[in-house]
């Protein structure tokens, strides 16, 4: 299979068409680095943070706040910011570029949650195309990094017309790539993602277009690339359950296997994927304790790390045939050691059997 990224992402640095979506509570350093282990040798793709509030970033400790913790070996990090005021945005992007090591800045204009809407962040910016473009301009005034924007769909024919006008305004203001989740704010995760809007946006707007929505397998990713002609595909929760999708796509494209997996083939059957998920789930848990060390972080508690891991299982577990049972057992863990014993016993204990991974699950919760 072939796919060429003909419009530059991160000014040409990106050569791989699959990327992780920024997700609250999920795209933190521990999960991010565990997923990165499946990236093929030679592949370059952007890596997100959780959503970062531009009002808080100027005063936050980057070595203490969980949303901005990073590993020194990470590269091509693109933090996603929420914001609509120039001074907080100015201070935030300067710190992210000069102190944190960002490779780009992503502006969230697609988040439909009430907390973002109450501050006129996220998808609420799509209610005012002129001001949304100004948010991009004010960001561009204070950073030399490439700027991307994540947005949602318009509703109906008039909504599509608005989406195109809105998107062109963002590009004129300085956005170098756009990611479209083709569901409206009202839909949230319900209904079917309208991939046709991705195709039309790619035809009408002259920058890299990244598609997002209803991708659960590498086959889905290939179908989106083919049907919409988008430059790349952004995958959310499915990549937290099936991170070797990166490996599968890389294998299809002729990339070498990930570091440490030389000579191996990407898991493809449900049983192979189930076994790989077991390894991955334990890796995520181990990385939580490595990158979020409780003893060194005064306001980090063991209970918080346990909640983070349970949240990972809640989002990734639905693809596992008995993921509900794993989640239930994890909910009874009273310490990190207890949690590690529980997860290890579930997958590799004397009563354990291979837990297959299903191809798809209902994502509309």
Task: Show which residues each predicted segment covers.
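Glycine-rich, positively charged N-terminal anion/phosphate-binding segment
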Residues: 2-8, 23-102
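Short, solvent-exposed helix-helix connector turns and helix-capping sites enriched
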Residues: 60-64, 128-129, 242, 335
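Alpha/beta catalytic cores of nucleotide-metabolism and tRNA/nucleoside-modifying enzymes
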Residues: 1-10, 14, 18-19, 134, ...
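Alpha/beta enzyme core
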Residues: 34-39, 90-121, 129-207, 223
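Short glycine-enriched, charge-decorated loop/helix-capping segments at active-site entrances
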Residues: 64-66, 120-126
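Active-site beta-loop-alpha junctions enriched in small/polar residues
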Residues: 23-25, 52-54, 82-84, 110-112, ...
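Short, electropositive, low-hydrophobicity segments enriched in small/polar residues
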Residues: 29, 87, 114, 126, ...
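Hydrophobic faces of well-ordered beta-strands that scaffold small-molecule active sites
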Residues: 18-22, 47-50, 77-81, 105, ...
């Amino acid at each position: 299979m072939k796919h060429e990224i003909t419009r530059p992402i991160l000014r040409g640095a990106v050569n791989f068409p699959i990327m992780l979506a920024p997700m609250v509570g999920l795209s933190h350093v521990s999960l991010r680095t565990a997923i990165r282990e499946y990236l093929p040798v030679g592949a370059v793709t952007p890596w997100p943070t959780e959503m970062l509030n531009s009002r808080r970033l100027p005063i936050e400790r980057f070595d203490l706040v969980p949303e901005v913790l990073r590993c020194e070996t990470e590269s091509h990090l693109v933090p996603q910011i929420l914001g609509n005021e120039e001074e907080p945005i100015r201070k935030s992007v300067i710190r992210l570029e000069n102190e944190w090591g960002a490779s780009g800045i992503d502006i969230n204009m697609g988040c439909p949650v009430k907390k973002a809407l109450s501050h006129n962040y996220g998808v609420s910016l799509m209610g005012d195309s002129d001001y949304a473009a100004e948010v991009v301009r004010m960001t561009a005034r204070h950073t030399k990094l490439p700027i991307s924007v994540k947005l949602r769909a318009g509703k109906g024919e008039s909504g599509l017309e608005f989406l195109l006008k809105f998107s062109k305004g963002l590009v004129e203001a300085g956005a170098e790539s756009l990611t479209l989740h083709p569901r409206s704010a009202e839909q949230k995760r319900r209904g079917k993602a309208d991939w046709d809007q991705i195709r039309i946006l790619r035809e009408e707007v002259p920058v890299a277009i990244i598609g997002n929505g209803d991708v659960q397998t590498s086959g889905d990713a290939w179908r989106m690339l083919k049907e919409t002609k988008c430059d790349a595909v952004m995958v959310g929760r499915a990549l937290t359950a099936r991170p070797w999708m990166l490996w599968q796509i890389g294998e299809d494209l002729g990339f070498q296997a990930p570091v440490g997996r030389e000579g191996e083939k990407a898991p493809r059957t449900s049983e192979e994927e189930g076994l790989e998920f077991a390894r991955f789930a334990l890796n995520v848990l181990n990385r939580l304790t490595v990158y979020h060390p409780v003893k060194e972080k005064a306001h980090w508690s063991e209970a918080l790390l346990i909640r983070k891991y349970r949240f990972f299982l809640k989002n990734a577990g639905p693809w596992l045939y008995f993921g509900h049972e794993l989640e239930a057992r994890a909910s009874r863990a009273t310490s990190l050691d207890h949690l590690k014993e529980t997860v290890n016993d579930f997958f590799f204990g004397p009563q354990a059997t291979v837990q297959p991974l299903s191809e798809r699950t209902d994502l509309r919760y």
